[in-house]
Amino acid sequence: MRIFALVLATLAALCSVASAAEHAATKQVVFVCEHGNVKSLMAASYFNQLAAQRGLPFHAVSRGSAPDSTTVPKPIVAGLHADGVDVSDFHPSKVAAADVVDAARVVTIGTELPANAAAEETHVERWDDVPPASTSYDAARSSLKAHVAELLDRLTAE
């Protein structure tokens, strides 16, 4: 019985070490749009889906340069839900220096990074060609999914 307990304790310790190493190896990508609750949220959601499907060590977050709401518009919640993503509990937050300082990539979508969130060593790119989701969810979705797939291809090649 004692040996069994020792084996279980050893396995538990190894699993937690592996989990910590796996978490440390995950690279963060930050998507930033003006309000942080539409384009950046869609991009982060599609990015996380595709990274998981490909088994890649990346995780994305959504931030806003000037969030003005605490919720996500219902059409966006519904559209992402149809794509298998639940954002019903998501609350937009403003991008901060802590978000971008260690990010593998920062992607601005139709906005600028606030001065207090700029980081010297951060790889920043702009996606200014994404159509408004309020005009056409499908067009925004297609544009973002294409950008996300291309970004993941580039990140895995680096």
Report residues per predicted region.
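Conserved active-site segments centered on acidic
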Residues: A21-V95
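Phosphate-binding/catalytic loops
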Residues: T111, A115-E158
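A short, aliphatic-rich alpha-helical micro-motif
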Residues: V100-V101
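Bacterial N-terminal signal peptides
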Residues: A5-C15
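A structural micro-motif
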Residues: L56-F58, A104, T122
